[in-house]
Amino acid sequence: MRNEISTLHRETGVAWDATAKLYEDSEKSDIAFLRDGGNNLMEPEQRILSDLETWCNCAIHLQCAGGKDTLSLLTQGAKEVIGIDISQRMIASAKRRSNSLQANASWYCCDVLDVPKSLDAIGDLLYTGRGALPWIMDIQKWAAIVRRLLKPKGRLFVFEGHPLDWIWDTNTSDIRFHVERNNYFTEKIVGGERWPFPFLARQEDPELVNLRMHERQWTLGQIFEALLNVGFNLIHFDEYPIPYWDQFPNIPKEILTRLPHTYSILAERN
């Protein structure tokens, strides 16, 4: 099973390498945004994390992509940030951003389930979310890794897309079950078709037609169980009617906001 999971993660990493150009193209604008004190974290994230300067010497960001959110943690007050991602091109893009800003940041390219032991127990904060968890094929191992990276009393913060959004049709103008993906409790692995990045990459380069990405849904219950099993104490949980990306472009806001589209978890390592 572990070898199978590694293969799925590796194939997804290759696909993210191929789609990284979309992040590379925004490097200059991201650098200017961050240099001017910009913060890419959403309002609930900024409010819950508050001023990191008072308690966070080191923030670790799992599945950091191009690093814009990672570097925003410095704007939020963290003294040092560490970004981890499976895509080499994403990490290279993140490094270019931080080097231009002379930011106190370091970057590691690896599967998040194989993070080096040298990072054990150094994080005051572990930050993740906004499309990160569905790419993880073993949520129990993920929770154990999160605990490993945090200091005692270190905090995990997750701001993620709500699992209910998996079951809705993204092409309709009202809330309607997806024809195939309509079971909240499904454990089926799917091919990343919910995301625009692979589609846009294939449009630019038809040779990428065989890109393979693998994601699956984790229910809120599965996520909480994984964290409780490794000894986290829950501090905060909330749900929000705001999506973190334009997943339902045809649904009017007054209808869309009747359902949760994101959630946040703040938990402390024992």
Locate the predicted segments by residue.
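Conserved class I S-adenosyl-L-methionine
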Residues: 155-200
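A short glycine-rich, Lys/Arg-flanked "PGG" loop and its adjoining helix->strand segment in the class I
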Residues: 140-155
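Short alpha-helix
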Residues: 214-238
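Conserved alpha-helix/loop element of class I SAM-dependent methyltransferases that forms part
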Residues: 29-57
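Core SAM-dependent methyltransferase catalytic element
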Residues: 230-232, 250-270
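Class I SAM-dependent methyltransferase SAM/SAH-binding core
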Residues: 58-115
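A short acidic, Gly/Pro-enriched loop at the edge of an enzyme's catalytic core
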Residues: 117-126
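N-terminal, positively charged/glycine-rich alpha-helical extensions of SAM-dependent methyltransferases
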Residues: 1-30
